[in-house]
């Protein structure tokens, strides 16, 4: 089948749904790729690059819609684009079906199948197709870069000959994909980073990234997690505590990045006008929720404004498009994974399996019918765990008796082994020469000490332990090499085996050491 990517006609959109690299992968599935001329130009992909990847470049959108069996886009289709769809054709793009009922109806009437990338279920198997997370990751990163562009100081603290520069203080509100990306970027730039989220389970994630989680003093336990990893609306009491905490933090923060969204609702207002007034001159607010009304009272969508007290508020809604090359690469990879699932036999034929949770969840029209909203994903039933028998609590006297019994058992075992070993040594000593006994005793002690040392090493330290054994193996191989010149055939054979085994250990040890050290290198 032919997969076509038209040029995005939404104003300011620079992304493209197919890159030369993704086109090569799609062709391996048996598909033929076409693209409208100039579609990838804003993202840095020329028509020549597509042609070199085996993609047919068509002169117009009309020609592309006519030729393609599957149309891949970034933005949802404009009405003029939807009018070009035909029965049996498949459209894969962001669609937002809940907000575009008329467009959904038009696609149904046209008989086209629409796969909405924003409707991909939030389940583990579908992570490779989760375009929302891919774009949110870019938005969080770009938000910090945009804040730094409008902030008049360093992120990291510095001590210079000209004086001391304090580090910037950054507050990230909302620790979803975009929020975590912003936290990671701000922390890596050296800023003192704080983060807040209504879901208490993300506190550990935030702290593991080097940021400080902002806790609220709230009597009732508030869990703001909803289905799909999103946040749920907060209670009025919790919201008041939340706003009070933000008012307390506002005068201290240099940069505030807000990312809070609730599915199907306008963005919650979390940074009020009085908080903006309390911020220092030169501070920056980046509102990633501006497309849904914004988390800040003063946000103006698609604009950057400066308040009378000198606070810059960035309300851009096209952060991923501002990194068009990277965004196009990630989005086209998400599209490729979706098409891989739609082409299970890799024969260039789409098989739209509506029994598949991911495909069913993302499909909003199919066979002339609207299939939105989808049913909840099927979850495999898990058998209830058998109740464990309660372990009887031992009294101090019973614990003491058990410890004594264990000690006696171990003592008897060790004394018996010692007696047998002593008898064996005496027996061998009666017939063996003194030189042999000296070597044999050293060997026995080495085995005993080595066993005790290795046995008591924690499992987590076995990898560095393998690296250290290179030195021991080096001693073994030297001893074996000295014995290879012996006139005894048996000694030579044993020495050769020793060299082989020690060599394997040395090579393996160096390999493990290399891999262990590579974990600490920044790629």
UniProtKB/Swiss-Prot annotation:
Periplasmic side: 486-489
GO MF, one annotated term: protein dimerization activity
InterPro entries (UniProt xref): AlaDH/PNT_N (IPR007886), AlaDH/PNT_NAD(H)-bd (IPR007698), NAD(P)-bd_dom_sf (IPR036291), NADP_transhyd_a (IPR026255), NADP_transhyd_a_C (IPR024605)
CDD domains from the UniProt entry: Rubrum_tdh (cd05304)
Disulfide bonding pattern of the chain: none
TM region(s), chain numbering: 412-432, 433-455, 465-485, 490-510
Cytoplasmic-side positions: 1-411, 456-464, 511-523
Enzyme nomenclature, EC number: 7.1.1.1
Catalysed reactions listed for this entry: NAD(+) + NADPH + H(+)(in) = NADH + NADP(+) + H(+)(out)
Pfam families: AlaDh_PNT_C (PF01262), AlaDh_PNT_N (PF05222), PNTB_4TM (PF12769)
A GO biological-process term: NADPH regeneration
Binding site for NAD(+): 127-130, 177, 197-199, 229
Gene inactivation effect: Loss of transhydrogenase activity. Sensitive to aerobic methanol, but can utilize methanol as a sole carbon source in the absence of oxygen. Not defective in formaldehyde oxidation under anaerobic conditions. Increased specific activities of other NADPH-producing enzymes. Has higher levels of glutathione disulfide and increased sensitivity to oxidative stress agents like diamine in a succinate-based minimal medium under aerobic conditions.
Listed GO CC annotations: plasma membrane
Domain of life: Bacteria
Localisation: Cell inner membrane
Membrane topology listed for this record: Multi-pass membrane protein
NCBIfam families recorded: pntA (TIGR00561), PRK09424.1 (NF006942)
Function in brief: The transhydrogenation between NADH and NADP is coupled to respiration and ATP hydrolysis and functions as a proton pump across the membrane.
Assembly mode: Heterodimer of an alpha (PntA) and a beta (PntB) chain.
Family in the record: Belongs to the AlaDH/PNT family.
Protein's UniProt name: NAD(P) transhydrogenase subunit alpha
Highest classification ranks of the organism: Bacteria, Pseudomonadati, Pseudomonadota, Alphaproteobacteria, Rhodobacterales
Gene it is expressed from: pntA
